[in-house]
Amino acid sequence: MASTGLPQLPPSQKAVIQSEKTPGAFEVSENRPVPVPKANELIVKVSAVSLNHCDWKMPGRVPCPGAVDGADYSGTIVRMGEIAALKSGFQIGDRVAGAQMASSRRRPWAGAFTEYLRDEYDMVWKVPDNLSWEQAAAIGCATTSTVGMALWISMKLPGTPENPIKEPKLVLVYGGSTASGTFAIQLLKLSGYKVVTTCSPKNFKLVEEYGADKAFDYHSATCGEDIRAYTNNTLEYALDIITEARTIRHCYAAIGRGGGRYCGFELLPEDLIATMRKSVKAEWVMGLEMTGLEIDLPGGYYRKANPELHTWFCDWKERYVALFGSGKTKTHPITVRQGGLEKVIDGIESMRRREVSGEKIVYPLYIKGC
């Protein structure tokens, strides 16, 4: 890697890591090494990070003491490996965004909550000029890739934003006021679908602004039955962002008598699914699969390497970047919190306590004016 004439990088950096002493807890390390890129990698100086539920869920389920945490980020390319420099189309100084495969036993260095990170060049995307650091970090890759996988790989929906269906069909997005939910709603509307969704009544206006045709209160014990009545027993597709026993039951209750497809964002409880209608095909997706790498996680999360899915992601990435760049889709509502990496842990704990609703928490790491 040639670095002649480039500013020297510091030898060490700060990072939010999984606690060495307390499983599921986090701490700020002051002396993590600044990475050196492999041939197909970039080094990115991180400008902003956003929070996802996986930032606290996965470390709790699969503790990796000392591993860097965090998925979504935006930042500036400061170094490039030889292959990345030749093939990526990027240049030093480009604004990029992406998602890290954090909390990995094989890749403990991988994580967004740090000052400098390394990433494969085909896992990042160039940030359009109309997006700020904070907006780009809020998009990241985790949400966009998982939603895309759910709609077109798992649920096999006909129609895309580029080629919408001509006769609208109904799709349920359970958890519409989440970042994944508002993105899914927008994609479905662009693809020609009618969208029913669930959220708290305080967020009805929010999901309607993003395109939902009808919102239902997920607190209601008859939520699923109410959706089934509203859709005249014809609903075929349910995307469950939340994926808990209660939400699975609601989604199955909403799907019409003819059956259909259900897709969750979490490992499905086999004992529960075994008791549900066989006319509904149930699957779940995991955004980490977009890397194409083996996902070496226990407890049902293991995945074989899937290079075909990575190829799909590389195409999908260019498509959703174009949607945001053209203004056809917009980011989830953002709440910017100051304090840098030292305060990221507070945000993670807020999410763990379920205090975040209808907003995406973003922490800028850059100095204004620089």
From Swiss-Prot:
Pathway per the UniProt entry: Mycotoxin biosynthesis
GO molecular function: nucleotide binding; oxidoreductase activity, acting on NAD(P)H
Complexes and interactors: Monomer.
Entry keyword set: NADP, Nucleotide-binding, Oxidoreductase
Gene3D superfamilies the UniProt entry points to: Medium-chain alcohol dehydrogenases, catalytic domain, NAD(P)-binding Rossmann-like Domain
Region of interest called Disordered, as start-end residue ranges on this chain: 1-32
Protein name: Trans-enoyl reductase xenG
Reported function: Trans-enoyl reductase; part of the gene cluster that mediates the biosynthesis of xenoacremones such as xenoacremone A, a compound that shows inhibitory activity toward the PI3K/AKT signaling pathway and which has the ability to induce apoptosis of A549 lung cancer cells. Within the pathway, cooperation of the hybrid PKS-NRPS xenE and the trans-acting enoyl reductase xenG is responsible for the formation of the reduced tyrosine-nonaketide derivative. The alpha/beta hydrolase xenA then accelerates intramolecular nucleophilic attack to give a pyrrolidone derivative.
InterPro entries given in the database record: ADH-like_C, ADH-like_N, GroES-like_sf, NAD(P)-bd_dom_sf, PKS_ER, Trans-enoyl_RdTase-like
Positions bound to NADP(+): 54-57, 177-180, 200-203, 218, 265-266, 356-357
Superkingdom classification of source: Eukaryota
Species name: Xenoacremonium sinensis (Endophyte fungus)
Entry EC number(s): 1.-.-.-
Consequence of gene disruption: Abolishes the production of xenoacremones A, B and C.
Record family assignment: Belongs to the zinc-containing alcohol dehydrogenase family.
Bilayer-spanning residue ranges: none
